[in-house]
Amino acid sequence: MPQINLMELAEQSFGASLEQLDDRRIYKLLVKLVQERSATCPLNNGKKKLYYISAEFLIGKLLINNMIDLGIYDEVKDQLTAAGHDLNKIEEFEVEPSLGNGGLGRLAACFLDSIATLGLTGDGVGLNYHYGLFRQRFVDNQQKAVPDEWLGEQDILVDDGRSYTVEFGDFAVTSKLVNIDVPGYGQPTKNRLRLFDLASVDDGLVPGSSIDFDKTEIAKNLTLFLYPDDSDEQGRLLRIYQEYFMVSNAAQLLIDEAVERGSNLHDLADYAVVQINDTHPTMVIPELIRLLTTEHGIEFDEAVTIVRSMVAYTNHTILAEALEKWPLASLQKVSPAIADIIVKLDEIAKAEHDDPRVAIIDEHDTVHMAHMDIHFGFSINGVAALHTKILEDTELHPFYEIYPEKFSNKTNGITFRRWIHGANPALASLLDDVIGTDWRSTGDLSKLAKFADDKDVLERLAATKVEAKAIMRQFMALEQGVTIPSNAIIDVQVKRIHEYKRQQMLALYIIWKYLDIKNGNRPKHPVTIIFGGKAAPAYTIAQDIIHLILTLSQWIANDPDVAPYLQVVMIENYNVTAAERVIPAADISEQISLASKEASGTSNMKFMLNGALTLCTLDGANVEIAELVGDENIYTFGASSKQVEQLYANGTYDAGVLYRTPGIKLLVDFITNPAFMATGNAERLQRLHDDIKGKDWFMALLDIEEYIQTKERVLADYEDQDAWMRKTLINIANAGTFSSDRTISQYNDEIWHLN
């Protein structure tokens, strides 16, 4: 590609020198540059194409990431710096797309980056949500959900020109397709993220400051929000309408493109493979069958055989409530044709396997979406070694007995392009100097390990952490209005708010630490504990956990005895942009889910890659991190997954007994201390207190004492900075395993078989 001359581009576009342009106009200039460069990249064009269908794609801002992938980042940054401009400040004008919520969507985004980087032919397919999940605001120490108006003047969406009709039970809607380019790192080619929108969508249904809207106006509301509130019947119906709209469009697109590439549809599996990312896209199975039979004249049995050989399913959860189940009557209302096919598929499954545990439709006429994926897909994978073993041995064991050949593990991964190149350029530069630049394309960081005792390298590594903390402090001051001490230990838990992730346990530790400091035990370094994440609006206890955290933050900040030594911060509207600032700065990575409940996690990998030490239960991919770095370079605690499973199976866990332990009772009852309750919302705090002491379904009280002991050991170890930085280096050196390039290579070698 031709060299970049930003001076010349500035004159051509604005008739001014680069030095004279303000940051907004430079942002426009860079967007145009990236679009023009990306437009010259041809699409990957293998015979067989992947369709990665997902309800979420948490892609983050794209300007810097795309410049890295297109190979122009360093050149652009150098020219801007020479002209007196800061690329990070320019990036602030970019609006982050609101197309996802948490790990599921961020994983999908990392995967798209790696698929393109490996030169594989594959697109992501999802929906273009106008208001995302919601924008999080904190009012009176409580979460308030408001619409996330991200679309506005959007520079990244390109009209595809395609449009499809989607037939529901008693009406039809029309879609329109927009694309986002996904260039591959070091590749001359690209793929795309294909986002379907509702042609008749009406943003006017959404009042300016509320996420409440008319859920009955299906022909106008389908693409307004990700995961609309499903706490009532109409909300649940809307979810089904939305999912069917997504997969019907995806299936029509897939068939059209396969025909364009030469398929006669009898050989469709040679031209297309579908990866179902969690159960939201499950209805693509009956929809493909419907299209092949009713639209293209293929016999039903052959259509089933075709689809069975081209659909693969990734399971992302062990939580039974997260495996989607819909009433058959609701599916019949949304699409009678799809419901009829599901009934036929259930009959086939029951004829083949007379076991009610594996039925698609159970005795209550409830449709189990994951069961359909397993029976009528050719591959089922978990996302971490422990997670896959639990699926095989427990959660999906009846299916594993039937289809052992379908099951495999594909441990999650993250793209180093975003999580080092973009998020932590100082660390990227250090790695280049110490081990060369091959890691940028191979993901292999293992050469770093031989420098574990090199004092100069360790000092330089410590300097990158200091720089990352300075960037994070500036971000927190400007965006969150929070001042963080320059010498603070940065302790971070960022993930969606859920009881199984146990933010409530970290809150109990904060209470313990507060009381310990009040008793005169002052830490040598101040400790700043940072939370980030959203709670589903209908998830009351999760909302209560947020309220407890925010109330603790206020309580501690107002106590002059404690505030100099302990700080609690919850990031408002935590997103990818915030993650890129906070993760590189972290010293401690909190991965404290109840063992056996987290499928994998990917924030654990991002923190590890950026040199934070992991404080964790042996859950999800934490197990693999521990195996890689060794016991001396990670901090583990808590009941094992087998112990937890035994407690659930026997029904012997008793939160009340643990609550009566004096040390634990002191912490839990602090929540209902009259003075503390007066600071917060008494109803919320009382409800959370009662839930923890009486139910504690995810066993925070089981692990709290060992957690406190282990965390105090972490803080003590931090004081020996030479040993701490050695542990940091060893963690980074072993993080290459978690490159999404490795994960995608495994998917392709073992599942997709793309050319």
Model features per residue range: what roles?
Residues 1-755:
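A conserved ligand/cofactor-binding region detector
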